[in-house]
Amino acid sequence: MAAAVLRAALQDWRSCLGRSYGRRKLSQTQGPPDNPGFVESVDEYQFVERLLPPTKIPEPPKHKHYPTPSGWQPPRDPLPSLPYFVRRSRMHNIPVYKEITHGNRQMTLIRKVEGDIWALQKDVEEFLSPLLGKTPITQVNEVTGTLRIKGYFDEQLKAWLLEKGF
C-alpha cells in the first residue's frame, strides 16, 4: 500500500517537471516579430572611437635638437654593439628606477635587460666603483632581466646608459 502511494506521488512529481514554470512554448506557426532589431550607424562611430583607449603608445615626435626641454633623448640610431641591450619602456624612457623596501633599504633597479646580463653587471660595477670607492652590491635576475644595485644611482645610471646609446 505504501509503495503504491509512493509510486503515485513520484509520477505526479515527474509530470510537474515536464512543465516549465512561468515560461510558455512558442508555437511553430508564429512568424518573426515585427521588431527590426537594431540599425547600424557608421556616422556616430567617431564618438565611440574617442572613448576607446589607443592600442599602442604613439612614436615620439621628431625634434630639431636633443635633449628635449623635458630631458628626453632618443636611443642612438646605430644601436651599440654590446653583448647586452637595455630596451626602453613603453613610454620610451630608460627603465632605471628607485626602489625602497623594508622602510630603509634603498635599491636601484635596471629592468628590460636582454642578452648577457652578467656583462651589464660587470660594466655597472666598473662604472660605479670610482663613485663609491668600493664595488657596489648587485643582484642579477636572469629570468626577469633585472639588475638591482644597492643604493640610489638612478640619475648616474640613466646618464651612463644614454651615453652608451640605449
From Swiss-Prot:
GO terms for molecular function: structural constituent of ribosome. One of its GO terms (biological process) is mitochondrial translation. Keywords: Mitochondrion, Ribonucleoprotein, Ribosomal protein. Its main location: mitochondrion. Signal peptide: none annotated. It comes from the Eukaryota. Gene3D superfamilies: SUI1-like domain. Residues 54-77 are annotated as: Disordered. It holds the Pfam family Img2. It is found in: Mitochondrion. InterPro entries: Ribosomal_mL49. The keyword Ribosomal protein applies. GO terms for cellular component: mitochondrial inner membrane; mitochondrial large ribosomal subunit; mitochondrial ribosome; mitochondrion. The keyword Mitochondrion applies. PANTHER family: LARGE RIBOSOMAL SUBUNIT PROTEIN ML49 (PTHR13477:SF0), MITOCHONDRIAL 39S RIBOSOMAL PROTEIN L49 (PTHR13477). Component of the mitochondrial ribosome large subunit (39S) which comprises a 16S rRNA and about 50 distinct proteins. Interacts with OXA1L. Belongs to the mitochondrion-specific ribosomal protein mL49 family. This is Large ribosomal subunit protein mL49. The gene is Mrpl49.
